[in-house]
Design a protein with these regions (language model features):
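Asp-based, Mg2+/Mn2+-dependent phosphohydrolase catalytic module
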Residues: 16, 30-156
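Short, acidic loop-to-helix structural element flanking the phosphoryl-transfer center
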Residues: 1-25, 62
Length: 156
């Protein structure tokens, strides 16, 4: 099933827009084979594929996020983790990375309990550098900021 996941409707276009200014790669606890198969099937235009397996440490271990910084020879403040999972974003932020929360209403299902959890996460998202509804909105926000602090690599 994981190999056949459909992307979120904004993913392909949003990643394409982000790639105009940033290096975009996933950072997943899934393996590289899985991520490559997902990208090929869904047409995800990542610049490269990174997995926590490369670092032999898995999120939320700080060595995973800092390993990405080593791969690209950048400081943590030049890395932005983009995710719908607040625990992942909290871990990246604790390492000094920039963070962008993407609200995905049905990430964990459509039941009432899942919706309450997602609404709580959205309320908590104010602690991150950016909070957006989709990747196109993220691309627009980053393009409008034109700030050097947003230079670097985008992850999700």
């Amino acid at each position: 099933v994981w190999h056949r996941l459909d992307p979120w409707p904004d993913s392909v276009a949003g990643i394409g827009r982000l790639r105009e200014h940033f290096i975009v790669t996933p950072l997943s606890n899934g393996n590289i084979g899985l991520l490559t198969a997902m990208a090929k099937r869904a047409g995800l235009p990542w610049d490269c594929v990174l997995s926590a397996e490369v670092f032999r440490h898995y999120k939320p271990d700080p060595r995973t996020y800092l390993g990405v910084c080593e791969v690209f020879d950048i400081a943590p403040a030049q890395l932005m983790l983009v995710a719908a999972h607040v625990d992942d974003l909290d871990a990246a932020k604790a390492c000094g990375c920039r963070t962008a929360y993407v609200h995905r209403p049905f990430e964990f299902g459509a039941g009432p309990e899942q919706q309450r959890e997602k609404d709580k996460a959205r309320d908590e998202a104010r602690r991150f550098d950016l909070a957006v509804d989709d990747l196109n909105a993220l691309a627009s926000r980053l393009a409008s900021s034109r700030s050097p602090r947003w230079s670097g690599v985008i992850r999700g």
